[in-house]
Regions:
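TRNA-recognition modules of translation machinery and tRNA-sensing kinases, especially anticodon-binding
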Residues: 1-173
Length: 173
């Protein structure tokens, strides 16, 4: 590129948040509902199921932290996917908590993974110490079997996060 520097978006949430702040959307009636559909790019070693360029459609609702708003976004996604005629869809929801309860869960998960280090894939034998959640996202058979028995984040939520998660579940039911 002749020494020029270019920036490729890795995902859509950060640019939406930047636009929200830059354009004074905090002064609008809340919540503010925004969406995007753009190409995004990853800078990592290619692996099965993960390409460097991909299209991402996203919805962001800013200004209302309620579980009902989370349910609204999930229902929007479900309706969209269903309208495409997709069959056999399954919805799984989870929570990794907040800055209060997540560190304890991350420590617990890290300890669990250390005990099963020899059973996880080679890539994650190196990575789990810095980001144990990545092991739970790995599609390799060895990591899938370890992940299936890993401690559940939902079982380690603080009271506020548990209340939010249960509120989301009851809204979706």
């Amino acid at each position: 590129l002749g020494g020029d520097s270019i920036t490729l978006k890795p995902e859509g949430t950060a640019p939406v948040c930047r636009a929200y702040i830059q354009h004074g959307m905090a002064n609008l009636p809340q919540p503010v509902r925004l969406f995007y559909e753009n190409p995004h790019f990853r800078y990592e070693r290619p692996q099965a199921g993960r390409v460097r360029q991909h299209h991402q459609f996203g919805v962001e609702i800013i200004g209302d932290p309620s579980p009902q708003v989370d349910a609204e976004v999930i229902e929007l996604g479900w309706t969209y996917l269903s309208s495409l005629g997709l069959q056999g869809l399954t919805l799984k929801i989870n929570s990794i908590g907040d800055s209060e309860c997540r560190p304890a869960y991350m420590e617990l998960l890290g300890t669990y993974l250390a005990e099963h280090e020899s059973s996880i894939c080679e890539d994650h034998q190196k990575r789990y110490k810095t980001n144990p959640l990545r092991v739970l996202d790995c599609k390799k058979r060895s990591c899938l079997s370890v992940s299936a028995e890993a401690p559940s984040s939902v079982d380690h939520l603080c009271d506020a996060c548990r209340e939010h998660f249960e509120g989301l579940r009851s809204t979706l039911d």
